Swiss-Prot record:
Segments traversing the membrane: none
Keywords for the protein's UniProt record, in alphabetical order: Carbohydrate metabolism, Glycogen biosynthesis, Glycogen metabolism, Glycosyltransferase, Transferase
The keyword Endoplasmic reticulum appears for this protein: no
Active site: D408 (nucleophile), E461 (proton donor)
Key word Transferase present: yes
Protein name according to UniProt: 1,4-alpha-glucan branching enzyme GlgB
Subunit annotation: Monomer.
PANTHER family associated with the record: 1,4-ALPHA-GLUCAN-BRANCHING ENZYME
Function: Catalyzes the formation of the alpha-1,6-glucosidic linkages in glycogen by scission of a 1,4-alpha-linked oligosaccharide from growing alpha-1,4-glucan chains and the subsequent attachment of the oligosaccharide to the alpha-1,6 position.
Organism: Actinobacillus pleuropneumoniae serotype 3 (strain JL03)
NCBIfam families linked: branching_enzym, PRK05402.1, PRK12313.1
Length: 777
């Protein structure tokens, strides 16, 4: 074909393609019918020649370059409804054979489009994003992205020299999705979506559904396979249940431990080899990871993510992360992920104004902008946004084996007026302050995970008294499994900061939590938020001199581990790091050596033994959320700042926890108990092993049948200064109790017999009485 007659269609598409605003490239490029013949149109701006090859490599036609912009047209000698062909493309320095992306049909099914538009696709990440696949025997990558208001979307990457003119995508008007299959693109390729918005602006965006991303400061997405599903270990997931011991070690992977020589991060493999044995030895049951979804700014700690489906590349590949989680599971440790779905950053490569419109966020800043964090708030009421977020929960549990999600900043999600003044927020449709769309998102996501998550749990960081956070949606609750008890944490830390002489006036700060203990399923958190921004370390919050600070801390941890609720401790707190947490440095592990003077090692040993005791005695965890599992024994001794309570197991066994928050030893302190038995001191925060003063009860404690505190029995204790002690009760065996009861009955019978008068005694008494009566007369 040496001459070519331009049609109006040609002229229109030449302009659209050369100016890069073609919205429907598949209607023109590739194989098409033209009267009695077929034509193949190819747009390659940098090419000099194009030949059409058959499947076996024969030249079918040589294309004519009909425009300097790079449009080639080849006419075939006959009609083809479909044709397996290739392109031989000549460039200035070489000639290479290529597949034509515009000969492949869309792999998006009508049902996919319908479900995605409706926001009910359970696993949209199996469709959207970049997926390695084979079409018609050709390997490549299927790209798809939701951008309903864009004029044109192209895939750009190192495979097409980041030229947005080369691979414009197919638009599906019914769903707003763009897609294209690019042959011969391989795993590891870098890519983005180049979006022409309705105002003519070019936006270069990372893939919202990317499974891997470049290392910051670069922002491209990386082609990688969708991770395979992880087989769920039912035994591990059972460890998430409310009647199981849950002790969570909260970790920031970038600062738990670093290479000493260059202060650089450990990678996922190194973390697995060091962190997991440590956590296992310390007796923690769960690891909670601060956010590891891709994020651009180290100083956000991961709480401003740009890639919810992409594990951060800071520490390695997605497969490396899966290996870390697998090794944790092999050690019997569950893994919880901090999940940030309340807001996202304003970085230009991220979700902000994704297709030129406010696609993921609200348009009105009174709904869509978070002024505290300079972030944007998701529009939960939009079907596709809901689907994007909700399915992400399933992605992490199914594809990485994550055992639970801790949802960040729930309060900021469910209140429209969160951290806003009057006039800075918009009421809901009923005039209220609740974000009904966010609540619906949380309820539906929690319900979905209950059904599909195979025992994965969801934990709320919710700092208000919003009712029903852990209640079922069928009871008008939100459906979380657990909620952080921020009130308990704030009250008790405030108490511990006081000089002991003033604690007597604020006794209720340690007891008030029981007033609402059974309103939710609580986790007691000492998280990363409490050791940053000038708040001091947990050790730094304790009052007193060095000895008192460490004694206070050990006593406080003991009180916490005895108190109802699951436990959470941020890294470094287990050995009483003295300074605030710094995300850019390793923890101060040197404190466990001679430089720590033994104090920090003592706290480490105490936390380890607390965890082991906690797991050993069901009384300390089985009935956390049942009033039958807790009873105050001493609640009103404010003058001596002593607290005592009994924790009970389902089988009736119990552990007594006693705390003394003054530096005065309480000798001969009597506490009433409900049953006779053998009482043994099993833990004492003042033991020399923990660097205490070694005051205690040294094993077995005598139980006496002396009433105290309304109980029929009592024990007399020596309560060390600034301490918490744990006392296990082994009730007397039933046979022994019955034998004692028999002895008591026999003694009572003998006593009654001894006191009952005999016939001779009665006769003598009668005669004496008769004689006395006669004398009286």
């Amino acid at each position: 074909m040496k001459t070519y007659t331009y049609s109006k269609q040609d002229l229109s598409f030449i302009e659209q393609l050369s100016q890069a605003y073609c919205k429907d490239p598949f209607s023109y490029l590739g194989l098409h019918q033209a009267g009695d013949v077929s034509v193949i149109r190819v747009f390659l701006p940098e090419a000099t020649t194009v030949k059409i090859l058959s499947a076996d490599g024969q030249i079918l036609s040589e294309a004519l370059k009909i425009d300097d912009s790079g449009l080639f047209v080849a006419q075939l000698s006959q009609q083809y409804s479909s044709l397996n062909y290739r392109l031989r493309v000549g460039y200035s320095l070489a000639e290479i054979d290529l597949e034509d992306p515009y000969r492949f049909t869309s792999s998006l099914l009508p049902m996919d489009n319908w479900l995605l538009a409706e926001g009910t696709h359970l696993r949209p990440y199996e469709i959207l994003g970049a997926h390695l696949k084979t079409q018609e025997g050709v390997s490549g990558v299927h790209f798809s992205v939701w951008a309903p208001n864009a004029r044109r979307v192209s895939v750009v990457g190192d495979f097409n020299y980041w030229d947005g003119r080369v691979n414009p995508m197919r638009f599906h008007a019914e769903s707003g999705i763009w897609d294209i299959f690019l042959p011969n693109v391989e795993k590891g390729a870098l890519y983005k979506f180049e979006i022409l918005d309705s105002n003519g602006n070019i936006r270069l965006k990372s893939d919202p559904y990317a499974f891997a991303s470049q290392f910051r400061p670069d922002t491209a997405s990386v082609v990688t396979g969708l991770p395979e599903k992880i087989e769920v270990d039912a035994k591990l997931r059972h460890a998430n249940e409310p009647d199981q011991p849950i002790s969570i070690y909260e970790v920031h992977l970038g600062s738990w431990r670093r290479h000493l020589e260059n202060n650089y991060w450990l990678n996922y493999e190194e973390i697995a080899n060091e962190l997991i044995p440590y956590v296992k030895d310390m007796g923690f049951t769960h690891i909670e990871l601060l956010p590891i979804t891709e994020y651009p700014f180290d100083g956000s700690w991961g709480y401003q993510p740009t890639g919810l489906y992409s594990p951060t590349s800071r520490f390695g590949s997605p497969d490396d992360l899966r290996t870390l989680i697998r090794k944790a599971h092999e050690a019997g440790i569950n893994v919880i992920l901090d999940w940030v779905v309340g807001h996202f950053p304003t970085d230009s490569h991220g979700l902000t104004e994704f297709d030129g419109s406010h696609l993921y966020e609200h348009q009105d800043p009174r709904e869509g902008y978070h002024q505290d964090w300079n972030t944007l708030i998701f529009n939960y009421g939009r079907h596709e946004v809901f689907n994007y977020l909700s399915s992400n929960a399933l992605y992490w549990t199914e594809r990485f084996g994550i055992d639970g999600l801790r949802v960040d900043a729930v309060s900021s999600m469910i209140y429209r007026d969160y951290s806003r003044k009057d006039g800075e927020w918009i009421p809901n449709q009923y005039g209220g302050r609740e974000n009904l769309e966010a609540l619906d998102f949380l309820r539906r996501t929690n319900r979905m995970l209950k059904k599909e998550g195979h025992g994965a749990v969801v934990i709320a960081e919710e700092s208000t008294s919003f009712a029903g956070i852990t209640h079922s949606p069928t009871e008008n609750g939100v459906g979380f499994d657990y909620k952080w008890n921020m009130g308990w944490m704030n009250d008790t830390l405030r108490y511990m900061s006081l000089d002991p002489i003033y604690r007597q006036y604020h006794h209720d700060w340690m007891t008030f939590g029981m007033m609402y203990q059974y309103s939710e399923k609580f986790v007691l958190p000492l998280s990363h938020d409490e050791v940053v921004h000038g708040k001091c370390s947990i050790l730094g919050k304790m009052s007193g001199d060095c000895w008192q600070k460490f004694a206070n801390l050990r006593a406080y941890y003991g009180y916490m581990w005895g108190y109802p609720g699951k436990k959470l401790l941020f890294m470094g707190n287990e050995f009483a790091q003295g300074r605030e947490w710094n995300y850019n440095e390793s923890l101060d592990w040197f404190l466990l050596g001679e430089q720590g003077g033994g104090w920090h090692k003592g706290v480490l040993n105490w936390v380890r033994d607390l965890n082991r005791t906690y797991q050993k005695y069901p009384a300390l965890y089985q009935l956390d959320y049942d009033p039958a599992g807790f009873e105050w024994l001493v609640v009103d001794d404010w003058q001596q700042s002593v607290f005592a309570f009994e924790r009970k197991a389902k089988n009736g066994e119990s552990v007594i926890v006693v705390s003394n928050f003054t530096p005065v030893v309480r000798h001969n302190y009597r506490i009433g108990v409900r049953q006779d038995g053998t009482y043994t001191e099993i833990l004492n925060s003042d033991a020399a092993y923990y660097e205490g003063s070694n005051v205690g009860n040294y094993g077995e404690i005598e139980c006496e049948a002396i009433e105290s505190h309304g109980k029929p029995f009592s024990i007399e204790l020596s309560i060390p200064p600034l301490s918490t002690i744990f006392i296990a009760c082994q009730p007397k065996p039933k046979e022994a109790v019955e034998a004692e009861q028999d002895i008591v009955k026999m003694a009572e019978v003998a006593m009654q017999k001894a006191l009952k008068p005999t016939k001779k005694t009665v006769s003598v008494k009668a005669k004496a009485h008769k004689k006395a009566h006669k004398n009286k007369k």
